[in-house]
Amino acid sequence: MPDIRPALQQAWLTQGLIARVLWPVSLIYGALVWLRKLLYRLDVFHAPHLPVPVIVVGNVFVGGVGKTPLVIALVKQLTARGLKVGVLSRGYGRSGDGSQSVTAQSSATEVGDEPVLIARACQVPVFVGKNRLQAGQHLLAQNPQIQVIVCDDGLQHMALAHDLALCVFDERGLGNGWLLPAGPLREPWPVDRSGYLQVITLSTSNYEIENPQRVNEQLLGKEEEQLQVQVQVLEKDKEKPKELKKPKADFVVPRVLADFAQQADGTTQALSIFCSQKVQALAGIGKPQVFFDMLTDKGIVLLATKALADHDDMRTIHIDPELGEVLCTEKDAVKLWNFQPTAWAVPLITEIPEELLNTILAHIGPKLSSAHGHQTT
């Protein structure tokens, strides 16, 4: 059976024939989304709070948009500020649904590739679970020192209340602006959650940012419990559909390739060395071509590339050793290293701007827990 995902993803960028045919179905989907939100608003469905602040890093554009590097950067920088941070994730692609602890040695098959990557990169407690509330409770029970929780994805998971949301966009923005399946949106934009929205722009260094707006001092004075902070990833893309819709943005959070690559045994090598070697690359992220372009911009000549779908099974791919060394993302390496330990993972590095970090801390500050993990009063 042919894979229709590429055609559908392309159709989501314009309001063309395929999107228009699917548009009536998106009305039904939209009605269900609206009804679900209404039931939560009327407290028919209850969204409990955990005793520590919960920051959600999510998206409304379905699929991979570059959340994980942002999650890793946020966790590291909150930790550098002296906070004890824990991470929750759904663990997409894993074999089970129950709540489970994740370590650097965990199997991606059992817990998902992104949670393993976060555990390895951040060295903080990580839990996965379809029920994010239950996973959060288990996380805090086993790690009572935790003061703040970062959720990797979960913007639409309303069963767990959150205190702050970072909504990530890539260069596709809102696509054609329509809901699934006629468009790429999981829910209508702007997100109707607290009535107050801000947009933060996350960009790679090789893309020219157009009119980024900064969050101003008035933002710090808002009293809304659930500030929705939106993040837009602007990436290199020469052919942007004319109908592409983009939200306004507030912050630029650069994302660049590291200057080194690493193998499964910890061996590292300067990325510049690959400029004079035979190299092939693969990527199973939301926009694989972006990773390939970033390697090319470093002067690396790629003899072949393999663009895989987000969370694809690495066991099914064929790697030709005649095409040279294999470069991949850290996320792909979590699974690829199980049978290709000599592959080189190239980290994507993101740094949260100081202004954005201060804004985040200002909004979660009133609920920050004590050193023993109990909510302050």
PLM features: residue spans?
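Walker A (P-loop) phosphate-binding motif
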Residues: R41-A104
